[in-house]
Each structure stands twice: as C-alpha cells, then as structure tokens.
Amino acid sequence: MADAATISKLEEGFKKLQGATDCKDVFDQLKQTDKHPNKDFGDVNQFVNVDPDGKFVISTRVRLIDDHFLFKEGDRFLQAANACRYWPSGRGIFHNDKKIISMQMGGDLGQVYRRLVSAVNEIEKRVPFSHHDRLGFLTFCPTNLGTTVRASVHIKLPKXEKLEEVAGKYSLQVRGTRGEHTEAEGGVYDISNKRRMGLTEFQAVKEMQDGILELIKIEKEMQ
C-alpha cells in the first residue's frame, strides 16, 4: 500500500484535473466510488506472434511504467501532479538500473509478455509495488496510473491508410519512429496501448494485440 502523503498528493492533483475545463467531458464520467480492477495478467497463452513471417514488426516491448526520466515544463498532467513546482529550480534525477522491460526483435508478443509476467511476479515476492484501490499502481506520471503497462511494437506500415481509424477503434497510441513528437521514418511507427486505467493488464495488452493484427491484415490487403 502507498503511504498517506503520496495518496494526499495524488488526490490533490486529481482535484485540479477535475476542475480543468478541458477535462470536463472525461471527469463527468468518473465516480469517486470507482475502483481500478485487481491485477490480472490473464492467460498468457492467448498472446501470439503477431508477425510470424517477420515482414512488418521490427521489435516488440512490454514494460511497466513509461520512462519519463526527463520532462518539459507545460505538460498539464505533470503540472496537476505538482511535478513542475518551483520550475526550473530543484530539478534532479535519481536513476538506477532497475527497469522492468521485456523486449526483443520480431513480433512474438506472447514470448515477450510471458517473460514480463514471470519477472514481475518474482520481483513482487521481495519488493511490493505501491498500489491504490481506486488509482491502481502508483507512478510519478499520472498518465500511467492504473496498470502502468505500455505494450508497444515498432512496425512498418508504409501503405496503411486507415491507421488512425484502427488506432481509435482499438485504443492504440501512434507515435513516430523515435517515440512521442517524432515523425515516422520509412513508414515505421511506434504503436502501443493507450489505456492504462480501468482495465486489467491482460486487457490492455490484448487491445494492443488485436489492433496490431488488424493493422497487419489491412497492410497485406493493400499490397
């Protein structure tokens, strides 16, 4: 469980977001009694190699907690979490080598996911993660509250004309080749699950898998 001070800061930031006019449509749907689902990695065998022929997916990665080691002033989510107070004074980073990331070349999402689940379960036997019944797993960046899971692929889709349409249908986030705020180079995109909160870890990764399979299907039809 998280300590009281951490919860207090999160609640304070949450109230600021509730009062933001550009967030009204989202927060009107939220209830104080809502709870984030319990951790559930589901049936790991339901995840497959999304690109067995190796024609589209360059690499696959599933990780807990987006890196966010450095950030710029002005992000409304970070401001709401009080991460930009006294800017630019007091900036510092404590960064160790404990990253929980499972990554490999190719599209074998099943193998990547199973390895991550195994690692997380072993780590939790010794070091419990901070968790809140309503907010899920707690991280510094409020956009990652909930499962904190980001499952992504680097995928080549030079002909995909329905990329944004499919991304919206499957709650996918489309980034450029080198991540957020970059362009796609040679038709290569970084595509990941968008939703973190209000669903299980299994559901988050399953959304990504279903969306990627649909994108590959459309790309093949265009060839």
From Swiss-Prot:
Similarity section: Belongs to the ATP:guanido phosphotransferase family.
Ligand binding (L-arginine): 141, 180
Organism lineage string: Eukaryota, Metazoa, Ecdysozoa, Arthropoda, Crustacea
GO cellular component, one term: extracellular space
Any GO molecular function: ATP binding
GO biological process: phosphocreatine biosynthetic process
Ranges for domain Phosphagen kinase C-terminal: 56-222
Catalysed reaction, written as an equation: L-arginine + ATP = N(omega)-phospho-L-arginine + ADP + H(+)
Top-rank taxon, per record: Eukaryota
This protein's name: Arginine kinase
EC number: 2.7.3.3
